Structures are given as structure tokens and as C-alpha cells.
Amino acid sequence: ENGLTEEDISILDSNELKKKEPNLTCHSGLYCTKEASTNYGMLTNAITNLAKKNKINFLLRHNVKYVEETSKDVNMIFSDNSTLTANFVINCAGGNSLDIAKKFRLLKGYSDLHFRGEYWVANSDIADLVKTNIYTVPRYPEFPFLDPHWIKRANGETEIGPNAVPVDSPEAYDSFITDIPTVLSKITDIVTGSTKKLLLNTDFISLVSKEFLS
């Protein structure tokens, strides 16, 4: 489905990997002969333009304040007090998906945690230490999505990351806190919702503290 065959992937020992990447030290690894690096900004713009050609409209900066449901349709009222009426809604709002689901009175027993991934651009003297993407074995098996890797970008830069800085909302791109009400609401969700058990997980607490300091 992703364009790879069994011949494209192999398990190599440390000596075999050393021949391909002299600066890499490991016991063994999965080696893939094919890889891709994507400029996600260009990809997003291309998909957006294609969608617009097919008469799809984008409503930017329209946060959903609340939802009104009738027997026939759904009215979504946005932060600017405009309204969108639909008879079928697909919720694929990324980090805001759970919040929107709750406006439909769904998944009330669930809560979520948000992390911001940050990348470091490697200096020129170390950018070419390896020629390919390197993914490490997760330090915390329960949270394999929070381990950094070595990435060769489409623009030629080499980056190391991401880390996973805990933040209060999906839009906290440059700070830790967007606003106090959001923070208080998130704390309440954590304490009363399904994520409260993470507060007793020593691996999770250790990971969060290290990532915050990074």
C-alpha cells in the first residue's frame, strides 16, 4: 500500500550498517532502500489548490463555539458568531477533534494531552554525519511516538527531533500557555478524565520533565 516491497526492507547487523553509515553505532537495525522527505507546506498548498478547483471552501480562523442539533441538521456556531448548517459532519480537526466531539455530547469520559514537537537544525560540521534518516529504538516503549530521530529534510537541512514539550492547547506554537482559562480547563480534564492515570506513570512523568527542560 505504501509502495514498498519485502525486497526494500532488510535487517542488518552492526557491521553491515557500519558499512553504509560509518558514524552510526548500534546492535542492528531495519534498513529501507527507499525513503522520502516532504515539504509539508508545499504539499498542503497543493492539496488546498486542488480542493478549491473542486469547489471546496476553507473557513480559516473559525473556531467552533457550540453546536445546535435538530432532527434534520446541525448548526455549528463559530467564534465570529457566523453559522454553518450541515446534515452530515465529519470531525477531523486534529488536536481539536476531542473538543469538537464533546460539543456533540460525545466521548465525555475522555481527555487529551497536547505536546509541541520542536526540531534542532544541525550545524554544518555535523549535518553530514549520516546520509539517511535514523530512527532510534524508543526509550519509553509505552510512548514510542515521543522519541527523537535524525532527519534529512527536503531543503537539504539536517534536523534532530522532535522533542515533546507539554502545552495547554494545539495552538501553543511559541509559548507554554495560551490563556489561563484554557490551562484551568485542561487541568480539570486531566484530573477528572481518562488521562489522570498518567500522573502515576513514572516513565511518563520522567519523560515529560526531561522534554520540558529541553
Regions found by a protein language model. Give the residues of each.
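Flavin-dependent oxidoreductases
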Residues: V67-D179
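Low-complexity, flexible helical/coil segments
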Residues: S14-P22, T44-T48, K65, A93-G95, ...
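Flavin (FAD/FMN) cofactor-binding core of flavoprotein oxidoreductases
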Residues: S10, S14-K19, S37, S111-R116, ...
